[in-house]
Amino acid sequence: DVKEQYELVHAGGGIVSHAHPFREEDYIPEIRLFPDCVDAVEGINATHESPASTSHKNILYNEKAIAYAKEHGLPITAGSDQHTTRMIGGGMLFDRKLSDEKDFCRAVLAGEAKAYWNGSEFYG
């Protein structure tokens, strides 16, 4: 149950960021969105835009995710989804040094995070 998992993550001090919510692949039978059971949305996934990507390449996945996050007032997270040494590009920036994973969670929820793609496009 999605709600139960969301509550368990929170009970452990974590946050839930919906990874690549609009990716369509044969192993993802349908797009399922849970705006009330996530704390953030992965708006930037490097494999969706990188020239080095050999799968999942579709810029619309990121564009839809960013619009979805904004529509629901959710912070935007980013990641490289790096499965090879050729894949780099997405990440998170903070204006201060984070002390640990709990500080990371607090900073994301407080809107301190900036998601970036390719070192030049920032969201958040």
Regions flagged by a language model, labelled:
Residues K3, E7, I15, E24-G124:
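Charged catalytic cores and adjacent phosphate/nucleic-acid-binding surfaces used
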